[in-house]
Amino acid sequence: MTNIRKTHPLMKIINSSFIDLPAPSNISAWWNFGSLLGICLILQILTGLFLAMHYTSDTTTAFSSVTHICRDVNYGWIIRYLHANGASMFFICLYMHVGRGLYYGSYTFTETWNIGIILLFTVMATAFMGYVLPWGQMSFWGATVITNLLSAIPYIGTDLVQWIWGGFSVDKATLTRFFAFHFILPFVVSALAAVHLLFLHETGSNNPSGIVSDSDKIPFHPYYTIKDILGALLLILVLMLLVLFSPDLLGDPDNYTPANPLSTPPHIKPEWYFLFAYAILRSIPNKLGGVLALVLSILILAIVPLLHTSKQRGMMFRPISQCLFWLLVADLLTLTWIGGQPVEHPYITIGQLASILYFMILLVLMPIASIIENNILKW
């Protein structure tokens, strides 16, 4: 009798992707984040679906409907906080996943890497629009400030902003369309994630050594399924600790005040996971320059494969590049801290230096370090 797992049209796709998939025998816990991102996405879609059943996307009732979910809906509070903190876990996993790709040279799979960048942009857009929905002070002013950045685009900027707003300010039309987009985009993300996996399975996974592992493969199940389950349990543990003990730790207190167009909060800032990009945006005095730097801070990932000058794939045996990589991580943490601070001395200078260093490491220092390491190999 033939195994249904290997013959059924649907089952054989699942089988070749998650069961009999040949995987390198030495991939570390850094390779867990792909599956964790999948779990985060499923969690966000499910909790979001239940929230959407009770949420109303109208400026007069949006804030009240979120309060109603927390107070009157059965387990509404936990669904709401799972969704809010689930987004934070999503971004932690995303940044770890991208960091792993940079460290181990996974970006040499250019198709997979480029789809990943598109995924990152899509998830960021989804999260931004989701932050607007509770219609608190930071929701309203965050939406106003970030959408207003598009007015820096020459000639069409102002018209573009008013088109996105659906009027002359962030109002009912804006909230309704943001809700519609926030609902549909996670499904777009799911489709892109499938394409991401499709491209990955064309080449097979990278591994910590960066050496081709075709001669040493093991089946995905049971070895990596059990490893992924362990990762998932740890993710759920951290998420539940956040949700049940300090659900508002990563949020902004200003968002518990209903949106008021007549009162600007003293410090407008996005959620913590956008602070590094926000700091780069603010570090350039010119509006258009700031917007370009903001976009380039993520888009720079697309040219990383072109700047790969090393003879080795990963950084496992490249000490100079390792130092630069961890300097980049420290720099991003500094930018995240600066993004949450008011625009005053010394934060302005620190932010500008950190922004310059960010682009310097990726564009100049890492390619030079790779060339030096190549020459050291000849000794």
Curated annotation (Swiss-Prot):
Heme b b562 binds at residues 83, 182. It comes from the Eukaryota. GO terms for molecular function: metal ion binding; ubiquinol-cytochrome-c reductase activity. A ubiquinone binds at residue 201. Keywords: Electron transport, Heme, Iron, Membrane, Metal-binding, Mitochondrion, Mitochondrion inner membrane, Respiratory chain, Transmembrane, Transmembrane helix, Transport, Ubiquinone. Signal peptide: none annotated. Binds 2 heme b groups non-covalently. Heme b b566 binds at residues 97, 196. The keyword Heme applies. GO terms for biological process: mitochondrial electron transport, ubiquinol to cytochrome c. Pfam families: Cytochrom_B_C, Cytochrome_B. One of its GO terms (cellular component) is mitochondrial inner membrane. It is a multi-pass membrane protein. Component of the ubiquinol-cytochrome c reductase complex (complex III or cytochrome b-c1 complex) that is part of the mitochondrial respiratory chain. The b-c1 complex mediates electron transfer from ubiquinol to cytochrome c. Contributes to the generation of a proton gradient across the mitochondrial membrane that is then used for ATP synthesis. Heme 1 (or BL or b562) is low-potential and absorbs at about 562 nm, and heme 2 (or BH or b566) is high-potential and absorbs at about 566 nm. The cytochrome bc1 complex contains 11 subunits: 3 respiratory subunits (MT-CYB, CYC1 and UQCRFS1), 2 core proteins (UQCRC1 and UQCRC2) and 6 low-molecular weight proteins (UQCRH/QCR6, UQCRB/QCR7, UQCRQ/QCR8, UQCR10/QCR9, UQCR11/QCR10 and a cleavage product of UQCRFS1). This cytochrome bc1 complex then forms a dimer. This is Cytochrome b. The gene is MT-CYB.
